Design a protein with these regions (language model features):
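Pyridoxal 5′-phosphate
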Residues: 1-215
Length: 215
């Protein structure tokens, strides 16, 4: 074991999750974090405190509201720190599906009929359906397909799809379908050469990989 490797104390980690004390779930391992996960006791305690103490309209002129606002600001700052972003670059929403739908509608004003949007068949529906709906407004949707033998997205296949009409490329950072981790930095570099936007779905990667959005 190298000096930079830290052993994971699995027993300690599991002890932080009340679900593993329940006979119905104690012998299971849960990997579908994107679809919903059990949470550790400290998260449960924070949620309980929110529901019983600070579930009010934030940023108003009374003490509980001020505390609620401070808690929201702190949460935003922590998310920003995790991915090396500025706090004004962070928006907390209800779900990735909803956030992508809002984003696609917001970006629609930047597009015109005939502009091209590239999606993949490796992505979760959240980062596909919202962009496919732009076809209703005259945008051309292209699909970057996986290699049928490896289930990987090949960068050369993306090159063949990109054109001077490409405006958006939507791609997952880590596929929860096949487990691939895509080289988002290399993909972004290529997409930016066409003066296009890249939209990365980090749901399956960010909780484990701590991406640096400034890198």
């Amino acid at each position: 074991m190298s000096k930079n490797t830290v052993a994971l104390d699995v027993d300690y980690v599991k002890s932080q999750f009340p679900a593993f004390k329940d006979p119905k779930s104690s012998k299971w391992s849960f990997f579908e974090n994107a679809g919903g996960s059990y949470v550790p006791i400290n998260v449960i305690d924070h949620l309980n405190h929110f529901m019983t103490s600070t579930k009010v309209q934030p940023y108003a002129e009374f003490d509980t509201s001020a505390i609620a606002g401070d808690n929201m600001d702190q949460a935003t700052a922590l998310f920003a720190e995790m991915i090396n972003a500025k706090t004004d670059e962070i928006i907390i929403g209800g779900s990735t599906t909803m956030n992508m739908y809002v984003l696609s509608n917001a970006m629609r004003s930047l597009l015109k009929p005939g502009d091209e949007v590239i999606v993949t068949n490796q992505d979760h529906e959240a980062n596909v359906g919202a962009w496919r709906r732009l076809a209703e407004h005259g945008m051309v949707i292209k699909e970057w397909q996986i290699n049928a033998n490896t289930a990987e997205l090949e960068i050369d296949d993306l090159k063949s799809l990109l054109s001077n009409k490409t405006k958006i490329v939507a791609v997952t950072h880590c596929s929860n379908i096949v487990g691939s981790i895509n080289d988002l930095k290399a993909i972004a570099k290529l997409v930016h050469e066409y003066d296009a936007y890249i939209v990365g779905d980090g749901v399956s990667y960010a909780p484990h990989g701590f991406p640096d959005v400034k890198d």
